[in-house]
């Protein structure tokens, strides 16, 4: 079975551990950060279709929900909804692969005056809005959900998140890799 992992820097943190946990599975992911939904959709042929996967595990949303320093949204919620729908269609129609959708992990601002992950302005509550929008779509499409947001919350997000309030500690990557490996194994049955 071939699995492609698509996602931002959060995926890049757990990917090497998932590969070690699933030695009988051909797990691959792009070397680069897949950033946001529009970026991933535009590179779907290179990152997904050309790899001919049986299963795609998708994890993006942080970059989509970012408020840029000028106060503009990186990807507005209506555009995000459209990108999620288009990505699902492209994977199903062109790659003929099954998919798992992973919710976006939480953000945490221990000091609201400090920048998070190099972005000076980020509203941590926006993750919930983007997760809700994606869940409405993927559930209506019958795509299984891997709730990585809940995994981090249940495992004490202050232990899972680095000081930047976005990226994972070693412990955070470990718990995410467990959840991703389990979700993949669940689709292999």
Map each language-model feature to its residues.
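Conserved SGNH/GDSL esterase-like catalytic core that processes O-acyl groups on lipids
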Residues: 1-86, 90
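Histidine-centered active-site loop/cap adjacent to the catalytic His
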Residues: 40, 44, 132, 144, ...
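Short acidic/His/Gly/Ser-rich catalytic and metal-binding motifs that mark active-site loops
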Residues: 65-68, 108-113, 153-158
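Short glycine-enriched, charge-decorated loop/helix-capping segments at active-site entrances
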Residues: 70-77, 116-123, 161-163
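Non-membrane alpha-helical structural segments and their capping/turn regions in soluble enzymes
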Residues: 74-85, 124-128, 132, 170, ...
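A short helix->loop->beta-strand "cap" motif at the edges of active sites that frequently abuts
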Residues: 93-99, 143
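Short, well-ordered beta-to-alpha junction loops that form the rim of enzyme active sites
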Residues: 103-106, 148-150
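Substrate-gating cap/lid alpha-helix
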Residues: 109-148
């Amino acid at each position: 079975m071939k699995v492609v992992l698509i996602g931002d820097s959060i995926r890049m943190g757990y990917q090497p551990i998932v590969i070690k946990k699933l030695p009988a599975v051909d797990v691959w992911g792009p070397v680069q950060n897949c950033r946001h939904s529009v970026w991933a959709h535009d590179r779907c042929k290179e990152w997904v279709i050309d790899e001919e996967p049986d299963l795609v595990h998708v994890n993006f949303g942080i970059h989509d929900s970012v408020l840029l320093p000028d106060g503009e949204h990186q990807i507005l919620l209506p555009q995000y909804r459209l990108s999620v729908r288009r990505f699902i269609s492209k994977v199903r129609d062109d790659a003929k692969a099954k998919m798992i959708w992973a919710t976006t992990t939480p953000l945490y601002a221990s000091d609201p005056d400090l920048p998070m992950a190099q972005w000076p302005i980020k509203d941590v509550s926006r993750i919930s809005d983007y997760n809700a929008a994606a869940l409405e779509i993927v559930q209506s499409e019958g795509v299984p959900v891997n709730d990585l947001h809940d995994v981090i919350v249940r495992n004490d997000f202050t232990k899972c998140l680095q000081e930047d309030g976005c990226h994972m500690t070693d412990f955070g990557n470990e718990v995410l890799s467990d959840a991703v490996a389990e979700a993949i194994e669940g689709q292999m049955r």
